[in-house]
């Protein structure tokens, strides 16, 4: 049963950002509290980003809702997320996409996220411990790719794993600020479809730890 607190959180999000009905339903279906570290449980239903281990953060639920909606979610099947973190974004995506693939480079976060997702019975979410810059070639091509960390550029490996005509949404570092951009793949190259808004994400880092 979905909690009143989670419902009220979604109401607050909707006041700030008009939610697609599918995104709102997905956000209401996933209890954020499950993904929040114990010391911050009392902040679970605020719109704040919250600290996790390994100098990482669970994104604001407002940000999660926006990033999900920016993917243009109608008539799509698969999505690859770069940066699983707590697993919250992947869980929300699982309510919309038939298949969700998420890569995490920090082993402790990967193990915790995998356990949470399994406990929730989200069998359509697949999580891998690996360098996100390399994507997950085994199940490519993907209809959508979502970066949950800020990139300086999009690696060719990920462009190759995106379906022709597919959409990639990523925070991009530009000079001294980050901006969320939506790209579309055309003729095997990415074209900026829209610059969406300024943002603040942890950076994409090479390798694993």
Curated annotation (Swiss-Prot):
Its main location: cytoplasm. Catalyzes the methyl esterification of L-isoaspartyl residues in peptides and proteins that result from spontaneous decomposition of normal L-aspartyl and L-asparaginyl residues. It plays a role in the repair and/or degradation of damaged proteins. The lineage of its organism: Bacteria, Pseudomonadati, Campylobacterota, Epsilonproteobacteria, Campylobacterales. This is Protein-L-isoaspartate O-methyltransferase. One of its GO terms (cellular component) is cytoplasm. The keyword Aminoacyl-tRNA synthetase does not apply. SUPFAM superfamilies: S-adenosyl-L-methionine-dependent methyltransferases. Belongs to the methyltransferase superfamily. L-isoaspartyl/D-aspartyl protein methyltransferase family. One of its GO terms (biological process) is protein repair. It is found in: Cytoplasm. Its EC number is 2.1.1.77.
């Amino acid at each position: 049963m979905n909690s009143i607190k989670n419902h009220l959180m979604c109401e607050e999000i909707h006041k700030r950002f008009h939610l697609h009905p599918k995104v709102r339903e997905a956000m209401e279906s996933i209890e954020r509290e499950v993904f929040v570290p114990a010391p911050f449980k009392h902040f679970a239903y605020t719109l704040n980003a919250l600290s996790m281990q390994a100098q990482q953060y669970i994104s604001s639920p407002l940000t999660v809702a926006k990033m999900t909606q920016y993917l243009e979610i109608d008539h799509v099947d698969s999505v690859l997320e770069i940066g699983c973190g707590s697993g919250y974004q992947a869980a929300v995506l699982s309510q919309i996409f038939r298949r969700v693939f998420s890569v995490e480079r920090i082993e402790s976060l990967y193990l915790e996220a995998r356990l949470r997702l399994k406990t929730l019975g989200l069998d359509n979410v697949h999580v891998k411990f690996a360098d996100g810059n390399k994507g997950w070639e085994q199940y490519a091509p993907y209809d959508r790719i979502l970066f949950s960390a800020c990139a300086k550029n999009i690696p060719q490996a990920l462009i190759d794993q995106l379906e022709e005509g597919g959409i990639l949404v990523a925070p991009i570092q530009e000079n001294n600020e980050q901006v969320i951009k939506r790209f579309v793949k055309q003729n095997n190259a990415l074209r900026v479809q829209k610059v969406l808004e300024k943002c603040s994400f942890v950076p994409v880092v090479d390798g694993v730890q």
